[in-house]
């Protein structure tokens, strides 16, 4: 969810905030320039134990099978989904591992991911890339352009230092000091929420933007902030990387499904990807991959093709 859009705001007291997180190429935010990496060491899931499923492998188009690789385009600036390793050249993240796992199920030699600026991924499907696995929120507009196979459900969440030492109340954040990542909708939302607090006669929210989640985590644990607001997967990943020193408080809200994008005219590859993803769901591999990044709660159980969305 590289960029996000705010819809009609609800009241401050409800805290059921109307924030939708979605990857949206119409924004001016450059997803590749706004990393959410929270650890310097590489994290990955070993896909070597995942078997090839012959019935699914038989569905793979000839050109993909002959090439032997499933080519994925991803904008690698969004941990834990897709980001660059410390070498600045190797894509890592759960979306990268998922692409490798799909290739394994489909009987291919490898799942390869290359960085691409977010708005360029969908136009390159069917030529440069076979799939786009890059935190694409499923929208009706995207489903008109490409086929979308659902696999995740991601929303926004509040995070606090474990034990909530600042007694942060997600139902009434007025007067709190909140850390957000620069350029996200959470930054926009926190500012809007602060205005609503003031209008309601309550204390303003002090919004502290940071380029890196590492900085947010350090200061949150150190007691400088009351809470942070980010994507639910980012909160889960930060909790894992901090050794449990950060935890989510309250429920994930305004969740939206994410999907794998495939060229609209490639029905054969679409079917292969959909069935391979369903296999990963049914066998627990998808959950295991996501758990490596603290994001297992985001896993869906049904790989729907072009599901109905609002």
What is the predicted function of each stretch?
Residues 152-160, 236, 240-278, 296-310:
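Periplasmic-binding protein-like
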Residues 18-21:
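C-terminal motif of bacterial Sec signal peptides marking the signal peptidase cleavage site
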Residues 38-132:
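Extracytoplasmic small-molecule ligand-binding "clamshell" domains
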Residues 23-26:
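Bacterial signal peptide processing site
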Residues 111-172:
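Acidic, polar ligand-binding/catalytic clefts
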Residues 91-105, 136-138, 155-212, 227, ...:
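Bilobed "Venus flytrap"/periplasmic-binding protein-like clamshell domains
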Residues 136-143, 191-192, 221-255:
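A ligand-binding cleft/hinge motif common to bilobed small-molecule-binding domains
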Residues 112-123, 165-166, 205-218, 256:
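Short helix-initiation/N-cap motifs at beta->coil->alpha
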């Amino acid at each position: 969810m590289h960029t996000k859009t705010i819809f009609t705001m609800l009241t401050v007291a409800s805290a059921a905030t109307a924030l939708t997180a979605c990857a949206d190429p119409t924004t001016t935010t450059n997803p590749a320039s706004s990393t959410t990496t929270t650890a310097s060491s590489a994290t990955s899931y070993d896909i070597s134990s995942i078997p090839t499923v012959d019935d699914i492998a038989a569905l793979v188009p000839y050109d993909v099978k002959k090439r032997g690789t499933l080519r994925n385009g991803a904008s690698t600036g969004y941990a834990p989904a897709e980001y660059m390793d410390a070498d600045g050249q190797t894509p890592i993240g759960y979306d990268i591992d998922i692409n490798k796992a799909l290739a394994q199920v489909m009987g291919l030699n490898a799942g390869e991911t290359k960085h691409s600026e977010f708005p360029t991924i969908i136009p390159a499907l069917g030529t440069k890339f076979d799939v786009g696995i890059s935190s694409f929120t499923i929208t009706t507009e995207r489903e008109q352009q490409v086929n979308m196979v659902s696999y995740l459900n991601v929303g926004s969440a509040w995070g606090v230092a474990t034990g909530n030492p600042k007694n942060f109340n997600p139902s009434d954040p007025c007067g709190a000091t909140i850390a957000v990542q620069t350029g996200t909708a959470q930054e926009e939302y926190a500012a809007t929420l602060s205005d609503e607090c003031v209008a309601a006669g309550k204390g303003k929210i002090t919004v502290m933007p940071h380029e890196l989640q590492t900085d947010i985590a350090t200061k949150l644990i150190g007691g400088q902030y009351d809470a942070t607001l980010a994507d639910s997967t980012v909160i889960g990943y930060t909790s894992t990387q901090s050794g449990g020193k950060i935890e989510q408080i309250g429920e994930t809200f305004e969740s939206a499904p994410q999907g794998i994008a495939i060229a609209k005219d490639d029905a054969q590859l679409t079917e292969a990807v959909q069935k391979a993803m369903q296999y990963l769901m049914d066998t627990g591999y998808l959950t295991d991959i996501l758990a490596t990044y603290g994001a297992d709660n985001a896993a869906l159980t049904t790989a729907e093709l072009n599901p109905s969305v609002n």
